Amino acid sequence: MRNNPITSDPVVSTLKEQNQGRIAQIIGPVLDVIFPSGKMPNIYNALIIKGRDTVGHQINVTCEVQQLLGNNRVRAVAMSATDGLMRGMKVIDTGAPLSVPVGGATLGRIFNVLGEPVDNLGPVDTRTTFPIHRSAPAFIQLDTKLSIFETGIKVVDLLAPYRRGGKIGLFGGAGVGKTVLIMELINNIAKAHGGVSVFGGVGERTREGNDLYMEMKESGVINEKNIAESKVALVYGQMNEPPGARMRVGLTALTMAEYFRDVNEQDVLLFIDNIFRFVQAGSEVSALLGRMPSAVGYQPTLSTEMGSLQERITSTKEGSITSIQAVYVPADDLTDPAPATTFAHLDATTVLSRGLAAKGIYPAVDPLDSTSTMLQPRIVGEEHYETAQRVKQTSQRYKELQDIIAILGLDELSEEDRLTVARARKIERFLSQPFFVAEVFTGSPGKYVGLAETIRGFQFILSGELDGLPEQAFYLVGNIDEATAKAMNLEEESKLKK
């Protein structure tokens, strides 16, 4: 741990005499810098350019060394706009990689790729910084136990359980509830696991980043009155920023998460939205650095770059980083190198369905499309596995019968199929759940449902014990006892109406 060489002026001033170069060439966000012989900076070192442009505006640009070209030249990628830079300007080598603030003081704040706060709430109250380029934990440090990461969300825990220290792909279009699901997970990990979350907005729209921040303040995930009680740190590198910033913002968020895992020994949730933009930014940088493109025009180092990020996301004996990554699939082509490389690292997929959202079933997680490598009898146990498989079979049969129902109606089905449809509709509604973060909008209190309660509830529905209850009794409730209580209330209400 050291003082941040980027933001701590005393460090920069001592380096001024030591290692100084000059800009030789500017190619958009890429700079060539000449250094004195024998004083070449290392790969990934941070370089700083300070000065004034032609109209007297202050310039403060940080770059990262990417290539050593020979003849005392290095090629660096800028982390902010290069407007106003000129050939011949002085460049200071900080002698260290980019470092960002870490620790509890980062919670409730918004940072850029350099770890500078951008929320107008003043400086961050910490002197502890970590470099963003770090090795993945050694094999000896890894926790090899396969354990489920309980989220308290029924549909996730039962049908596509998350692995502690695993990586989950989140697939869903606009307006199907991705943000609300993310916020509920942040809320639940804080309450149930005493953990914290880090959100990395990689190549996001600025509006989306702002909306997320506002919604987090409304729902209490970020506590405005006491910022230290917030449950999440936000790191943004928006669409309008240079590719260097978008390529490195994921590492900045991951570095903050690593501190909570390794030093505070906590369980951490790391959100990356969107992992495709990380690949896209790497592709832009690769082209600017003059590398030959590979398949479909992507960078030849695609697998290496993805691996260097993903391998740091893991469980150690101290704590865990469980990562949930939104995955954009270009032109819905799952064989595209970007999503295909991502899939190789995922332990589970959570697919959000527009059809379920249209029915008002939230969270709109598709029970048939969502998958998990953890759903095996030797990991989750025979009871959990058996229940999940029966829920999927019932839902699948209902899906197959929907066309027949639409054309001929329910009456034309066999007695057995009618029973299957009735139970499937109850299951579909019971997979919905009121969220804590949606309380302010819906007025109904949120529910955290333990895994044992979830399994018990679905076993009751599948056994046929609750066939006599109306299906609306299962909509937006927590455990099965609430559903039976709701059924009694509905019955009393209908009697009063008569």
Curated annotation (Swiss-Prot):
InterPro entries: AAA+_ATPase, ATP-synt_VA_C, ATP_synth_F1_bsu, ATPase_a/bsu_AS, ATPase_alpha/beta_chains, ATPase_F1/V1/A1_a/bsu_N, ATPase_F1/V1/A1_a/bsu_N_sf, ATPase_F1/V1/A1_a/bsu_nucl-bd. The keyword Ion transport applies. It comes from the Eukaryota. GO terms for biological process: proton motive force-driven mitochondrial ATP synthesis. Its main location: plastid. Keywords: ATP synthesis, ATP-binding, CF(1), Chloroplast, Hydrogen ion transport, Ion transport, Membrane, Nucleotide-binding, Plastid, Thylakoid, Translocase, Transport. PROSITE patterns: ATPASE_ALPHA_BETA (PS00152). Belongs to the ATPase alpha/beta chains family. This is ATP synthase subunit beta, chloroplastic. It comes from Phalaenopsis aphrodite subsp. formosana.
